[in-house]
């Protein structure tokens, strides 16, 4: 059952990615709506997979890389669908959906067997900490997509070479606003994830903070986004600067999530 | 029945001729009725815009119909036919259908893709419908033209980009700011181009206008016109940060706005984007201003470059539009031909059926020792003979109906079999087909 839901999700995300890329080539309203419906169907299947796995394992399924990548992808799609409902910019999906699909596809590269939980992970904080963290990651991923679109569109406007792509991309103003929105959603979630992680660490290991590589990199990520938010609110950083920082932030975040797990050893490294 | 189009446009006649031939849009009843009074003209629609005057009719007599419209146009406007004739084009059949589809889709317009023409044809059709000078053929024809134009509009990007400098500027502003309703325009100098561009921005929802000029009185006057705020030229850099869009067209011989000024202004705006449009020649704004973060500068050449690339894009989209029209012509032509062929088939069949029935009745009445099922058998026999005989001509007519040269066959059949040539059947049929 579980494997079926997984395969179904992967297949639908693949279809949605193709549909959104087709929309990028031929931006017809109908195609955009169809893409969104496909993606929504994938989201439902993905939720089913996650819930099913939760019931089977008896804990939130974010305890190994396979599960984390899958959950990351689920959060990206969920947050994206919210933005889609609000802004109706299907083209954003052309940039975000492939990310979700790739995360999902990457998860197939890691063992998916449900393993008994390590005692430290047996806690109510598992859900709070990890879900918050991944929702914030998802918001920053959407910001990443919008930032790339911003830089492309800005390049067209500055260079005055207005190709067909220029017509398809939304206005700079909207892209900047999405970037900001993502930040205001993602940053509090990340902050909360770090705080809840610290509380959990205290109850599991007796110390709030132990400078484990994951913790260190989380803090770095937090600082990058804090700087961006601060810059936006006080000195009015916007546009290109904000877009570049959103992209930098996303890569730091990716390293925090993947790099630390794969290359550095620590309490967060899943085996 | 044929469709005939006679007219002239910006492509065939200069404005002084077009003016003379134009019909006053509010007084269409008289010319429409006059057209319908002419012999052999069954239906008529007149399209009259500043770029074209066209008469659409349905008639049985193509050559006669063309000649009669030409004479009508000359007589009605009191122009000698010799002067008018060289400017007129006349189409019938498929060419007429193609022509009107192209006109409605704005492929024949001065600016390809401009949307006004469709509305103008709709208005023209509205008059014809009001005065009942259009009937089943032109009704169907024009409705088809409207739907073709709509298809062209939705399936191609023929009208999706701005093709004038002012509109290009508005379009660019939309790509930078999104919504323009909370944006402010600053006019520097009071040139005509600047005014025009400012009007486009106001029509597109820009909220505030500020005007500055070396002569302050001129700024005050122009500001009044736009219900804006005059700014003294000396205060320009004190006020510039309040503007999102800056339109400049002074007669200055040197740059009046330099990167340093703009950097300062943009800092005061907390990096909120600015869009500078330099319409002046020589230019007012240093091109290096474009390098300042969140500042976009377009001069006249840049804008014209945008327009040129948009026009090129339209030309490419026009090719797709022509393909759509090709497809639709076939469909409409088929309908028109069937309209012609079907009543003839119906008439032919009923003629045969009447003859068969009459003869059968005569025979039955005089046949004394008819076997019990004789009447039934004779009925079946005669029906079978009639059907067998009628099958080849019916099939042939349906086939030619889809190809062309319909008139020839239809006329021959009608003459040979003395069929009724009334309009009423065609009309009934047409209504059924609607």
UniProtKB/Swiss-Prot annotation, chain B:
Keywords: NADP, Oxidoreductase, Porphyrin biosynthesis. Pfam families: GlutR_dimer (PF00745), GlutR_N (PF05201), Shikimate_DH (PF01488). The active site is at residue 50. It catalyses: (S)-4-amino-5-oxopentanoate + tRNA(Glu) + NADP(+) = L-glutamyl-tRNA(Glu) + NADPH + H(+). NADP(+) binds at residues 189-194. One of its GO terms (biological process) is protoporphyrinogen IX biosynthetic process from glutamate. Its EC number is 1.2.1.70. Pathway: Porphyrin-containing compound metabolism; protoporphyrin-IX biosynthesis; 5-aminolevulinate from L-glutamyl-tRNA(Glu): step 1/2. Belongs to the glutamyl-tRNA reductase family. PANTHER family: GLUTAMYL-TRNA REDUCTASE. Possesses an unusual extended V-shaped dimeric structure with each monomer consisting of three distinct domains arranged along a curved 'spinal' alpha-helix. The N-terminal catalytic domain specifically recognizes the glutamate moiety of the substrate. The second domain is the NADPH-binding domain, and the third C-terminal domain is responsible for dimerization. Homodimer. During catalysis, the active site Cys acts as a nucleophile attacking the alpha-carbonyl group of tRNA-bound glutamate with the formation of a thioester intermediate between enzyme and glutamate, and the concomitant release of tRNA(Glu). The thioester intermediate is finally reduced by direct hydride transfer from NADPH, to form the product GSA. This is Glutamyl-tRNA reductase.
């Amino acid at each position: 059952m579980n494997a079926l839901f997984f395969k179904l999700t992967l297949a639908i995300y693949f279809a949605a990615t193709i549909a959104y890329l087709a929309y990028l080539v031929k931006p017809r309203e109908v195609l955009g709506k169809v893409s969104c419906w496909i993606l929504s169907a994938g989201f439902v299947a993905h939720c089913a997979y996650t819930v099913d796995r939760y019931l089977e394992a008896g804990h939130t399924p974010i305890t190994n890389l396979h599960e984390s990548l899958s959950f990351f992808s689920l959060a990206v799609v969920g947050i994206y669908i919210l933005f889609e409902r609000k802004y109706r910019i299907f083209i954003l999906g052309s940039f975000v959906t492939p990310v979700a699909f790739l995360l999902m596809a990457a998860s197939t590269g890691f063992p998916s067997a449900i393993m008994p939980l390590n005692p430290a992970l047996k806690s109510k904080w598992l859900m709070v900490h990890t879900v918050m963290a991944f929702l914030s990651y998802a918001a920053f991923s959407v910001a990443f997509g919008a930032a790339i679109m911003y830089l492309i569109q800005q390049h067209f406007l500055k260079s005055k070479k207005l190709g067909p792509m220029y017509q398809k991309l939304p206005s700079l103003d909207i892209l900047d606003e999405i970037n900001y929105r993502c930040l205001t959603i993602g940053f509090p979630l990340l902050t909360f994830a770090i705080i809840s992680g610290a509380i959990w660490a205290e109850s599991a290991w007796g110390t709030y903070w132990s400078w484990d590589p994951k913790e260190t990199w989380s803090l770095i990520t937090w600082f990058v986004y804090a700087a961006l938010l601060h810059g936006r609110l006080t000195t009015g950083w916007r546009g290109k600067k904000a877009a570049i920082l959103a992209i930098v932030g996303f890569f730091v975040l990716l390293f925090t999530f993947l790099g630390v797990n794969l290359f550095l050893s620590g309490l967060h490294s899943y085996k | 029945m044929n469709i005939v189009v006679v007219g002239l446009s910006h492509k065939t006649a200069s404005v002084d001729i077009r003016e003379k031939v134009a019909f006053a849009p509010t007084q269409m009843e008289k010319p429409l009725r006059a057209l319908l009074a002419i012999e052999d003209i069954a239906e008529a629609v007149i399209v009259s815009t500043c770029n074209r005057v066209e008469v659409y009719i349905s008639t049985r007599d193509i050559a006669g119909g063309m000649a009669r419209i030409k004479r009508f146009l000359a007589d009605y406007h009191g122009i000698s036919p010799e002067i008018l004739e060289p400017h007129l084009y006349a189409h019938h059949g498929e060419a007429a259908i193609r022509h009107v589809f192209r006109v409605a889709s704005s492929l024949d317009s001065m600016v390809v893709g401009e949307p006004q023409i469709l509305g103008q044809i709709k208005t023209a059709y509205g008059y014809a419908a009001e005065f009942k000078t259009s009937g089943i053929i032109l009704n169907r024809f024009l409705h088809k033209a409207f739907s073709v134009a709509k298809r062209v509009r939705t399936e191609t990007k023929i009208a999706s980009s701005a093709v004038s400098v002012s509109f290009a500027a508005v379009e660019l502003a939309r790509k930078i700011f999104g919504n323009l309703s909370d944006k402010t325009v600053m006019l520097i100098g009071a040139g005509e181009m600047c005014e025009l561009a400012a009007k486009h921005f106001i029509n597109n929802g820009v909220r505030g206008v500020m005007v500055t000029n070396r002569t302050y009185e001129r700024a005050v006057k122009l500001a009044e016109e736009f219900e804006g705020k005059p700014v003294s030229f000396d205060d320009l850099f004190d006020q510039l940060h309040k503007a999102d869009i800056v339109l400049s067209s002074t007669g200055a011989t040197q740059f009046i706005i330099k990167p340093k000024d703009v950097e300062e202004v943009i800092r005061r705006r907390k990096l909120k984007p600015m869009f500078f449009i330099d319409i002046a020649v020589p230019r007012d704004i240093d091109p290096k201003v474009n390098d300042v973060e969140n500042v976009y500068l377009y001069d006249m050449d840049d804008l014209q470059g945008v327009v040129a690339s948009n026009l090129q894009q339209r030309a490419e989209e026009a090719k797709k539009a022509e393909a759509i029209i090709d497809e639709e012509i076939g469909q409409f032509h088929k309908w028109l031909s069937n309209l012609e062929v079907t009543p003839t088939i119906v008439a032919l069949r009923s003629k045969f059926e009447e003859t068969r029935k009459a003869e059968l009745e005569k025979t039955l009445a005089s046949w004394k020792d008819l076997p019990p099922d004789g009447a039934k058998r004779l009925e079946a026999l005669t029906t079978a003979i009639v059907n067998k005989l009628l099958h080849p001509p019916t099939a042939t007519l349906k086939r030619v109906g889809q190809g062309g040269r319909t008139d020839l066959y239809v006329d021959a059949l009608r003459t040979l079999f003395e069929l009724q040539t009334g309009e009423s059947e065609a009309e009934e049929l047409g209504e059924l087909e609607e």
